[in-house]
């Protein structure tokens, strides 16, 4: 038997069944996890291609292995398309993830024990922005800024005060759970005042930046990092951008050989495909719809009496503060999951509960918008979510409400076919 001709079902029925069941799950739930999306069949085809066989340490035309002519072409396409999409001079498409993109920047620009200033976790920051359990919190002196205690908006005056007080080497503008726009120009002013590098982490809003629905950090940040999934709707991976070519050279060396070995050429090819899709006019319409859907969801939940953090949203993220309702984020997310609505528990600013419990939940509209959902559908989803949350108030057993909402979810999801 030639192993090269083995198909998955014949070789490994267990994994085959897992993939089949996961496809069924994705096809039968309302997916509201803000960091997830559905890629095109073209992206899947590229990522599942024979490019996975090719080892290609180094960069195009500067590899440590022979036989890289075709994968060089794929990586150059990905680089050039990324530069065009974000209107910048430098792009590195090799990071395996957004976390490793951030690590590459730290390795390129910082020394151990340098000070970094980033958003705190409960205010919406990411683990890699200096959180204690993360490598960024172990290798560097980290200082966290919070949002305003009344408005929950970024407090630029407080960031400036902390920057002057602590003199960071790197200032980070970015988030994983913040529903409003970021003023990158203000961040650059603060960075310049203390002589810091400015890194913008746009993992969540990259699609909005690429389409002009959010201010681009490229003219302001020394370096920009992102994931390539989420609103970019590509394969899971990382991306680094800059208009500073000298910084780009440092990052290239930091990523390889400093942090990674061989790049994942099948994933890079899939990134190239996604970037090409994102350069089409239809993608701008998609991002506009993502934002409109998020606003519709937020308003729907507000009308049912639920507190939306900051009073609304400017992007794909909707954060619900459940403190006054006496419901934990963990309990809400689990009950919604049983009703066919997938989201995640999420800390809210100044949250006093455990990060494994939390006082809030986070929704995102990117994935369902890819399936074709419009504002009216998200209004309906908002009412479904509210039904579940209403049922949880002073009630340990929410099973009847979960079954009722699950039947409504099934009716709605049938209107939006999945992969053929």
From Swiss-Prot:
Its EC number is 2.1.2.1. It is an enzyme of class 2 (transferase). Pathway: One-carbon metabolism; tetrahydrofolate interconversion; Amino-acid biosynthesis; glycine biosynthesis; glycine from L-serine: step 1/1. One of its GO terms (biological process) is tetrahydrofolate interconversion. Keywords: Amino-acid biosynthesis, Cytoplasm, One-carbon metabolism, Pyridoxal phosphate, Transferase. InterPro entries: PyrdxlP-dep_Trfase (IPR015424), PyrdxlP-dep_Trfase_major (IPR015421), PyrdxlP-dep_Trfase_small (IPR015422), Ser_HO-MeTrfase (IPR001085), Ser_HO-MeTrfase-like (IPR049943), Ser_HO-MeTrfase_PLP_BS (IPR019798), SHMT-like_dom (IPR039429). Pfam families: SHMT (PF00464). One of its GO terms (molecular function) is pyridoxal phosphate binding. It is found in: Cytoplasm. (6S)-5,6,7,8-tetrahydrofolate binds at residues 121, 125-127, 246, 354-356. It catalyses: (6R)-5,10-methylene-5,6,7,8-tetrahydrofolate + glycine + H2O = (6S)-5,6,7,8-tetrahydrofolate + L-serine. HAMAP family: SHMT (MF_00051). Catalyzes the reversible interconversion of serine and glycine with tetrahydrofolate (THF) serving as the one-carbon carrier. This reaction serves as the major source of one-carbon groups required for the biosynthesis of purines, thymidylate, methionine, and other important biomolecules. Also exhibits THF-independent aldolase activity toward beta-hydroxyamino acids, producing glycine and aldehydes, via a retro-aldol mechanism. This is Serine hydroxymethyltransferase. It comes from Rickettsia typhi (strain ATCC VR-144 / Wilmington). The lineage of its organism: Bacteria, Pseudomonadati, Pseudomonadota, Alphaproteobacteria, Rickettsiales.
């Amino acid at each position: 038997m030639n192993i090269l001709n083995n198909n998955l079902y014949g070789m490994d029925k267990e994994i085959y069944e897992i993939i089949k069941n996961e496809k069924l799950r994705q096809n039968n739930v309302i997916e509201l996890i803000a960091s997830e999306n559905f890629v095109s069949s073209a992206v899947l085809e590229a990522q599942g291609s024979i490019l996975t066989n090719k080892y290609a340490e180094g960069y195009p035309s500067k590899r440590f292995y022979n036989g890289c002519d075709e994968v060089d072409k794929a990586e150059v396409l990905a680089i050039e398309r990324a530069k065009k999409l974000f209107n910048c001079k430098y792009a590195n498409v090799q990071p395996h993830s957004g976390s490793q993109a951030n690590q590459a920047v730290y390795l390129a620009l910082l020394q151990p024990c340098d000070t970094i200033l980033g958003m705190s976790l409960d205010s919406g920051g990411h683990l890699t922005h200096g959180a204690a359990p993360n490598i960024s919190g172990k290798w560097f002196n980290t200082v966290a800024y919070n949002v305003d205690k009344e408005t929950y908006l970024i407090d630029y005056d407080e960031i400036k005060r902390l920057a002057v007080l602590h003199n960071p080497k790197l200032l980070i503008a970015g988030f994983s759970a913040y529903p409003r726009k970021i003023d990158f120009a203000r961040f650059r002013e603060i960075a310049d005042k203390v002589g810091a590098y400015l890194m913008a982490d746009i993992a969540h809003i990259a699609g909005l930046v690429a389409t002009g629905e959010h201010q681009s950090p490229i003219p302001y940040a020394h370096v920009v990092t992102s994931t390539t999934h989420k609103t970019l709707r590509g394969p899971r991976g990382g991306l680094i951008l800059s208009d500073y070519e000298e910084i780009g050279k440092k990052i290239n060396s930091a990523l390889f050989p400093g942090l990674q070995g061989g790049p994942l050429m099948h994933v890079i090819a899939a990134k190239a495909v996604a970037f090409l899709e994102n350069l089409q006019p239809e993608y701008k319409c998609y991002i506009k719809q993502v934002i409109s859907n998020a606003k519709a969801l937020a308003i729907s939940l507000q009308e049912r009496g639920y507190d939306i953090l900051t009073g609304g949203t400017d992007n794909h993220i909707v954060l619900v503060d459940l403190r006054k309702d006496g419901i934990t984020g963990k309990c809400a997310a689990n009950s919604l999951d049983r009703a066919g609505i997938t989201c995640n528990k999420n800390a809210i600013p100044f949250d006093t509960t455990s990060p494994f419990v939390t006082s809030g939940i986070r929704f995102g509209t990117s994935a369902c918008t890819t399936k074709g959902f419009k504002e009216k559908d998200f209004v309906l989803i908002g009412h479904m979510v509210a039904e579940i949350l209403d049922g949880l108030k002073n009630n340990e057993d929410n099973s009847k409400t979960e079954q009722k909402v699950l039947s409504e979810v099934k009716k709605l999801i049938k209107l939006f076919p999945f992969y053929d």
